[in-house]
């Protein structure tokens, strides 16, 4: 049997592969809004009901509970394994939102509203003002975008006679959805919108609001082609799902008018509608001018009185639902998303959610925005972006470094940048942290490598052009680090300086304000090859390349609600627990890995380490130590509320913090006898630990962390 493809199909497949490889996803939320009817609960325009009693404080805000409701489209041909991967991705996103946002919960199950204009043929004027007189015989229920809402999620239908006070029930109230603050319908389908724009991975909209204007329900549609095995990227699906869900929760142009001013609510006053959320600046650019947003913008740029600019591509006279790309590279809420490891939930976006009035934002959540930090009032304008001296924009088409210095970048532009050029990450081979990549002989690709501007050469003319190259780095303090070139010693690299490396001609530029931020001095291990006893073990490797820290620890989980513990439910619980621990420690969820056997109880061995599928972040240098100090300030427990498992308790089996395994360089003076002694001691310790574990733990099968890849980067033979 032969298979033929039309030129359109071939073009579409090539385009899809190209966009996927670039990890760029376009968002069409603003166009989807125009097709989504919204059902509201009698929202009061100027004054809204008090969100919490006069005497209460923020204690009445509780973690946001988002409940996904899965629906498959008729043309969604994906496997059960792919569906499970999607559920795991959304579970991570909902846990992230639950730890970030809190709401004032309503009692009972969530019941959505019916649209009176759909189910009612006519209404009374008096005395039963605006109450339904006759039901529409053609009424076929409610929809959320293209999704039909189940009747048991909806309120009932009642009709009134002219004068009677009691109505007649035509449709009973549904049971509702328990333990839910926001109901998310999840659809998988290859819709016309998916086919029209191959770069669209998913799109979403809200469709119901409560009396205060807060969205109650929405829908997210995942395009089937991006969920197929050959295209699937878990980190990218998580990124896009978070972006779209933030739209449905309130970051949407059609909801700006519903944002509330609750600054006086703590004194017992009712929240009021904000007079105006958006306005244009002197250049005609729409910006959000709300108090917390302006405060965070001022802290970010180093000036006062600046609003946050919104995307103007396609919306010359309207406010957009995205941040302007020229100002917010790396933000989760730009219209064109960068690769997941270069995109973050930023403080300006969190400030917007604070100013919505419906949410309390967790102040301990780590958020970052490096793009434009301290660049001043005129940063990001089309008239100023031609100045490449700021280190953010560039000119021409040179090979340099992405502004986070995790990747090499090519100086280029796109339709959202309005002629400005930035260093966009290379499509292939530019990740300095990926050891499989290769480059010039002096380069080192490794989890601890970063991109540096350099023109280093060995024995050749030093007049080469400066471009991005990958070298090892190690942090010594805040914005203080060393750099290592292939076959060189560690060299101090003062931030902002140009340095030379022994044995090479040329220079390296040491970036300032983007490496070793938030550094904490490692109190559990040193940067010299010394032996550390106790829970913390220093493993020495005979290699010139240091490896990233690997954390291993064990937890015991208890739940208050009984379940029949199938392997699927256990796996679901494990994914949830890993997400909670990651959020608590402030590390990426993918940093934590575990495994489980069907005959085991709820005790899990967990390993934290960077991998190819989990690239490091700018804070990667402190990720392991964040886990180490997770329970030092109190009892070794984490207790949280789960929508499925009720109350969940996570207990660290050892009373001390998790053990850290850190690899260091082995100096030439460490002789074989010392190595043998260490190996013998390790074997004795392993036997002792095995007996102790068999005696006291109900669950065994703990596994040691895999040794990180220490091999030298692969260098093509013609470059050696």
Curated annotation (Swiss-Prot):
Molecular functions (GO terms): metal ion binding; metalloendopeptidase activity; peptidase activity
Pfam families: Peptidase_M8
GO cellular component: cytoplasm; membrane
Biological processes annotated in GO: cell adhesion; determination of heart left/right asymmetry; establishment of left/right asymmetry; proteolysis
Record note on disruption phenotype: Embryos with CRISPR-induced cirop null present heterotaxy phenotype (heart looping and intestine defects). No other ciliopathy-related phenotypes such as body curvature, kidney cysts or hydrocephalus are observed in cirop mutant embryos.
Record topological domains on the Extracellular side: 26-668
Keyword field: Hydrolase, Membrane, Metal-binding, Metalloprotease, Protease, Signal, Transmembrane, Transmembrane helix, Zinc
Bound cofactor: record note: Binds 1 zinc ion per subunit.
Enzyme class per UniProt: hydrolase
Residues annotated for Zn(2+) binding in this entry: 243, 247, 322
Signal peptide residue numbers: 1-25
Subcellular location per the Swiss-Prot or TrEMBL entry: Membrane
Cofactor(s) annotated in UniProt: Zn(2+)
Membrane-protein topology: Single-pass type I membrane protein
Residue numbers annotated as active site: 244
Enzyme Commission identifier(s): 3.4.24.-
Keyword Acetylation in record: no
Residue intervals on the Cytoplasmic side: 690-720
Principal cellular location given in the protein's record: membrane
InterPro entries recorded: Peptidase_M8 (IPR001577)
Transmembrane regions listed in the UniProt entry: 669-689
Cross-referenced PANTHER family: CILIATED LEFT-RIGHT ORGANIZER METALLOPEPTIDASE, LEISHMANOLYSIN-LIKE PEPTIDASE
Functional note: Putative metalloprotease playing a role in the process of LR patterning.
Family as reported in the entry's similarity comment: Belongs to the peptidase M8 family.
Protein name: Ciliated left-right organizer metallopeptidase
Organism: Xenopus laevis (African clawed frog)
Species lineage: Eukaryota, Metazoa, Chordata, Craniata, Vertebrata
Gene from which the chain derives: cirop
């Amino acid at each position: 049997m032969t298979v033929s493809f039309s030129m359109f199909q071939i073009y579409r497949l090539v385009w899809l592969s190209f966009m996927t490889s670039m990890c760029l996803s376009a968002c069409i939320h603003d166009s989807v809004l125009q097709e989504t009817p919204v059902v509201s609960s009698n929202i009061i325009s100027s004054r809204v009901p008090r969100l919490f009693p006069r005497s209460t404080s923020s204690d009445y805000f509780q973690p946001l509970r988002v409940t996904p409701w899965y629906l498959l489209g008729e043309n969604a041909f994906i496997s059960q394994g792919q569906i499970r991967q999607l559920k795991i991705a959304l579970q991570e996103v909902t846990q992230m939102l639950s730890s970030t946002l809190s709401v004032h919960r309503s009692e009972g199950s969530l019941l959505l509203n019916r649209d009176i204009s759909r189910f009612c043929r006519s209404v009374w004027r008096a005395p039963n003002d605006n109450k339904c007189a006759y039901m529409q015989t053609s009424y076929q229920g409610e929809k959320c975008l293209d999704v039909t809402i189940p009747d048991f999620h909806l309120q009932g239908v009642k009709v009134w006679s002219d004068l009677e006070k009691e109505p007649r029930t035509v449709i009973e109230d549904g049971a509702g959805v328990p333990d839910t603050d926001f109901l998310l319908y999840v659809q998988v389908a290859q819709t016309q919108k998916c086919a029209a724009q191959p770069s669209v991975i998913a799109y979403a909209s809200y469709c119901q609001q409560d009396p205060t204007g807060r969205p109650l329900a929405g829908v997210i549609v995942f395009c089937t082609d991006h969920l197929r095995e050959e295209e699937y990227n878990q980190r990218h699906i998580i990124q896009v799902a978070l972006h779209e869900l933030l739209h449905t929760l309130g970051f949407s142009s059609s909801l700006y008018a519903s944002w509330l001013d609750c600054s006086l609510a703590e004194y017992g006053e009712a929240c009021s509608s904000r007079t105006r959320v958006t306005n244009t600046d002197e250049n005609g650019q729409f910006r959000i001018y709300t108090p917390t947003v302006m405060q965070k913008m001022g802290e970010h740029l180093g000036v006062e009185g600046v609003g946050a600019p919104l995307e103007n591509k396609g919306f010359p006279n309207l406010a957009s639902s995205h941040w302007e790309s020229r100002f917010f590279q790396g933000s989760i809420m730009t219209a064109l998303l960068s690769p997941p490891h270069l995109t973050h939930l930023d403080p300006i976006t969190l400030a917007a959610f604070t100013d919505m009035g419906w949410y309390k934002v967790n102040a301990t959540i780590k958020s970052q925005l490096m793009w434009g930090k301290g660049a001043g009032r005129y940063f990001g304008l089309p008239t100023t972006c031609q100045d490449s001296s700021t280190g953010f924009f560039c000119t021409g088409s040179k090979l340099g470094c992405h502004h986070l210095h995790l990747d090499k970048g090519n100086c280029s532009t796109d339709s959202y940048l309005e002629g400005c050029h930035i260093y966009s990450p290379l499509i292939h081979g530019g990740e300095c942290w990926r050891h499989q990549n290769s480059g010039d002989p002096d380069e080192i690709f490794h989890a601890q490598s970063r991109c540096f501007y350099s023109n280093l050469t060995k024995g050749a003319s030093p007049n080469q052009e400066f471009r991005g190259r990958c070298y090892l780095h190690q942090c010594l303090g805040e914005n203080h680090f060393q750099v290592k070139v292939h076959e060189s010693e560690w060299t101090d690299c003062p931030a902002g300086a140009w340095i030379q490396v022994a044995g090479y001609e040329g220079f390296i530029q040491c970036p300032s304000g983007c490496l070793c931020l938030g550094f904490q001095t490692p109190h559990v291990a040193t940067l010299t090859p010394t032996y550390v006893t106790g829970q913390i073990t220093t493993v020495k490797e005979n290699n010139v390349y240091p490896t990233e820290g690997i954390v291993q620890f064990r937890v015991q989980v208890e739940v208050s609600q009984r379940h029949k513990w199938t392997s699927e439910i256990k796996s679901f619980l494990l994914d949830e627990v890993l997400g909670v621990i990651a959020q608590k420690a402030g590390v990426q969820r993918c940093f934590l890995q575990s495994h489980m056997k069907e005959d085991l109880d709820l005790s899990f061995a967990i390993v934290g380490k960077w991998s190819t599928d989990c690239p490091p972040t700018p804070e990667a240098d402190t990720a392991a130590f964040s886990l180490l100090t997770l329970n030092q300030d109190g009892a070794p427990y984490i207790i949280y509320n789960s929508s499925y498992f009720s109350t969940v308790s996570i207990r660290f089996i050892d009373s001390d913090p998790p053990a850290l395994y850190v690899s260091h360089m082995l100096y030439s003076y460490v002789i074989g006898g010392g190595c043998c002694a260490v190996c013998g001691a390790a074997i004795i310790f392993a036997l002792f630990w095995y007996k102790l574990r068999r005696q006291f733990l109900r669950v065994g099968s703990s596994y040691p962390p895999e040794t990180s890849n220490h091999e030298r980067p692969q260098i093509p033979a013609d470059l050696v």
